[in-house]
């Protein structure tokens, strides 16, 4: 019988700790990442006709190279599409990661886990293992995050593999500055997890600022496309914290505004610059799969 399989996989916001999920780092000490699955999706569809011929198609709400984990979500969607119904989310995430590794991706595991699981998660990486703690702030605190953490697509594409290579090359030879930066990012992940669990806005802001300082220690070029504009807003006390999403060097930037009443003003300001605001909500479902007989 002909059938159609529809899959939806969310992308993510990496609040803090990204970079430390890469195996070369978490083989030495734990990686600590906090991320949020969001309602910017990769959708895949597979149609199997009566003669068992296949047709597979994909669409994405965000372009790849945006820093929102779209590539990881795409592979979670692919694995979910071709596997049988009822596949465990953790198994799906690991299969998607291993699939990317076969294609030469040397990044970490956070994107696949965020997309497969949904929600807000504190992920701890030790060697090849992943431990997940789901964080469930109150509805009020979630609304604060959704209303005060703004995302903007700069339309400057980054290639995360190129950005990662130089950092990890230096880390492997024991570069103290790189190690310091990565450890700062790890500490930011732990602080962010604490801030979300205790609903401390100041901890969330401090964690994002610590994460950005750690990324700047890895290389100031990673935040350079955003620095001039966002430094001005920080000095004006309109922005409390900001960071590049993903590896940086372009793509999407996230910023926490100091007051919700500044939201429209800041969106208008960046629209003039050519940046696009990305409205978002927390996705709690993770990857979903529906199958229909035709």
Task: List the predicted regions and their residue ranges.
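Conserved N-terminal helical subregion
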Residues: 31
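Glycine-rich nucleotide-binding loop
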Residues: 248-250
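Glycine/charged-rich beta-loop-alpha catalytic/anionic-binding loops adjacent to active sites
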Residues: 52-64
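Stable alpha-helical structural segments in soluble proteins, enriched in small hydrophobic residues
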Residues: 73-85
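C-terminal nucleotide
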Residues: 1-16, 21-27, 35-53, 84-88, ...
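Short, conserved phosphate/pyrophosphate- and ester-handling motifs at nucleotide-, phospho-/glycolipid
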Residues: 71, 246
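Short pre-catalytic strand/loop immediately N-terminal to key active-site residues, enriched for Gly-Thr
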Residues: 62-66, 240-242
């Amino acid at each position: 019988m002909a059938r159609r399989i529809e899959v939806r996989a969310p992308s993510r916001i990496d609040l803090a700790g990204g970079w430390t999920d890469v195996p070369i780092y978490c083989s030495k000490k734990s990686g600590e990442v906090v991320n949020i699955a969001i309602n910017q999706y990769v959708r895949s569809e597979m149609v199997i006709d009566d003669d068992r011929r296949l047709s597979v198609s994909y669409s994405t709400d965000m372009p790849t190279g945006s820093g929102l984990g779209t590539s990881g979500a795409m592979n979670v969607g692919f694995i979910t599409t071709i596997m049988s119904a009822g596949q465990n989310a953790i198994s799906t995430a690991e299969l998607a990661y291993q699939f990317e590794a076969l294609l030469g991706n040397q990044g970490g595991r956070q994107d696949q886990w965020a997309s497969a699981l949904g929600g807000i998660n504190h992920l701890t990486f030790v060697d090849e293992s992943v431990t997940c703690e789901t964080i469930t702030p109150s509805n009020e605190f979630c609304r604060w995050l959704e209303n005060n953490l703004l995302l903007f697509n700069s339309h400057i594409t980054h290639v995360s593999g190129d950005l990662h290579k130089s950092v990890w090359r230096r880390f492997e030879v024991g570069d103290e500055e790189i190690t310091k930066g990565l450890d700062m990012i790890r500490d930011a992940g732990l602080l962010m997890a604490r801030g979300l669990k205790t609903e401390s806005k100041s901890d969330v802001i401090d964690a994002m600022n610590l994460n950005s300082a750690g990324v700047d220690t890895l290389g100031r070029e990673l935040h350079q496309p955003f620095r001039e504009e966002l430094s001005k807003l920080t000095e004006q006390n309109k922005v409390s914290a900001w960071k590049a999403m993903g590896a940086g060097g372009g793509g999407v930037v996230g910023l926490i505004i100091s007051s919700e009443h500044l939201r429209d003003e800041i969106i208008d300001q960046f629209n003039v610059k050519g940046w696009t605001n990305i409205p978002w909500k927390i996705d709690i479902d993770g990857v979903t799969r529906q199958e229909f007989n035709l």
